[in-house]
């Protein structure tokens, strides 16, 4: 049923303006979204969504039966259904991973609102953050693979424009989603620092900015609970020793995470700027082909020149022989 809707919606994209790649791309994304939502609805056993789509398909068939030109156009577009599926299916997992990142980010936003409550689980927050990092790495690898297999920029066929528009649309969605994730992490860190400053003031322990950073690195964000757990001076001393031992390791871990995030940002910028580099490379390849072709043509011209010289010599010899024969005939006669 989802496949039956694809040719009809793709026909609308073609009938509006075949040369407008942006409008075709937006309609293609709408087709893909509608197909995905329909498949999810069917797997979940939602009969209401199936009936709505059936009614829409029935109304579309009634309208098409009233206008014969639309019927002919619809019959012509059915042959493109498999091609559209081939374009959309490879991006299904990417869309699912983007949805997973968005869901994790929404969950972390809800958890950040309860950071001061007992129900807040910092380990769960770290787990969601690590999941987003893993998904981001996987998506970056997938986008690199799809980027390498995109059609050439000088290919203006409908299928090529669909592939390019779908790729750049999903890639921009990933970039926007990742920017939101980084903004959330910055806001969350600021909120945690603010809470730690407030807690230190309440327990009459003024902490410097460096000490607050150290508390965050050691995931010590609940000073009231920690204060009750550290009932004796021995336990406090043990905690200080443990913090000193793992301080350098935490700093190293944080530095590695920052470098990793920096490399991901650089990789995103490189992908955004790679289009110009690919065009330059394309023109360089074309110039190389033309140079090779010119060399072949020069070789052919040289061969033709040699053949022409041989023909000229043969003609001169023949003419000399004819003149000699005529002279001899004239002398004897």
Curated annotation (Swiss-Prot):
Disulfide bonds, paired cysteine numbers: none
Q: Gene Ontology terms, cellular component aspect?
A: cytoplasm; endomembrane system; plasma membrane; postsynaptic membrane; presynapse; SNARE complex
Q: Where is this region: Disordered?
A: 50-81
A GO molecular-function annotation: SNAP receptor activity
Which keywords, in A-to-Z order, does the entry hold?
A: Coiled coil, Membrane, Neurotransmitter transport, Transmembrane, Transmembrane helix, Transport
List all membrane-crossing ranges. Answer: 313-333
In terms of SMART domains, this protein maps to: t_SNARE
Please give the PROSITE patterns that the UniProt record associates with this protein: T_SNARE
Q: Which Pfam families match?
A: SNARE
Compositional bias ranges of the Low complexity kind? 50-66
Query: Where the protein is mainly located, per its record?
Result: membrane
Could you tell me where this protein is found in the cell?
Answer: Membrane
* Biological processes, Gene Ontology terms: exocytosis; intracellular protein transport; membrane fusion; regulation of synaptic assembly at neuromuscular junction; retrograde trans-synaptic signaling; synaptic vesicle docking; vesicle docking; vesicle fusion
Topology: which residues are Cytoplasmic? 1-312
Q: How does it sit in the membrane?
A: Single-pass type IV membrane protein
InterPro entries documented for this protein: SNARE, Syntaxin, T_SNARE_dom
Which parts form a coiled-coil structure per UniProt? 91-116
Domain t-SNARE coiled-coil homology residues, every copy? 239-301
Family of this protein: Belongs to the syntaxin family.
What does this gene product do?
Answer: Potentially involved in docking of synaptic vesicles at presynaptic active zones.
Q: What is this protein called?
A: Syntaxin-4
Q: According to the entry, what is the taxonomic lineage of the organism? A: Eukaryota, Metazoa, Ecdysozoa, Arthropoda, Hexapoda
């Amino acid at each position: 049923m989802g496949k039956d809707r694809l040719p009809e919606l793709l026909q609308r994209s073609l009938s509006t303006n075949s040369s407008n790649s942006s409008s075709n791309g937006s309609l293609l994304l709408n087709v893909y979204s509608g197909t995905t939502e329909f498949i999810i609805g069917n797997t979940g056993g939602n009969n209401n969504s199936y009936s709505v789509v059936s009614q829409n398909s029935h109304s579309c068939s009634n309208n098409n039966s009233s206008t014969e030109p639309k019927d002919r156009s619809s019959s012509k577009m059915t042959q493109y259904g498999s091609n559209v599926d081939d374009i959309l299916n490879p991006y299904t997992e990417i869309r699912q991973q983007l949805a997973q990142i968005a869901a994790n980010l929404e969950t972390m936003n809800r958890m950040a609102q309860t950071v001061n409550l007992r129900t807040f689980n910092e380990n769960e927050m770290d787990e969601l953050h690590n999941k987003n990092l893993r998904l981001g790495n996987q998506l970056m690898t997938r986008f690199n693979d799809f980027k390498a297999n995109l059609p050439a920029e000088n290919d203006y066929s409908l299928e090529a424009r669909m592939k390019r528009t779908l790729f750049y649309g999903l890639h921009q969605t990933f970039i926007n989603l990742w920017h939101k994730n980084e903004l959330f992490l910055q806001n969350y860190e600021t909120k945690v620092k603010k809470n730690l400053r407030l807690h230190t003031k309440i327990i009459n322990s003024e902490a410097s900015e460096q000490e607050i950073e150290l508390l965050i690195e050691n995931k010590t964000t609940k000073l009231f609970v920690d204060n009750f757990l550290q009932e004796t001076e021995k336990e406090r001393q043990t905690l200080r020793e443990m913090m000193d031992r793992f301080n350098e390791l935490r700093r190293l871990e944080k530095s590695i995470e920052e470098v990793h995030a920096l490399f991901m940002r650089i990789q995103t910028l490189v992908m955004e700027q790679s289009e110009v580099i690919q065009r330059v490379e394309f023109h360089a390849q074309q110039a190389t082909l033309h140079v090779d072709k010119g060399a072949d043509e020069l070789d052919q011209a040289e061969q033709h020149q040699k053949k022409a010289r041989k023909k000229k010599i043969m003609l001169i010899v023949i003419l000399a022989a004819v003149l000699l024969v005529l002279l001899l005939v004239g002398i004897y006669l």
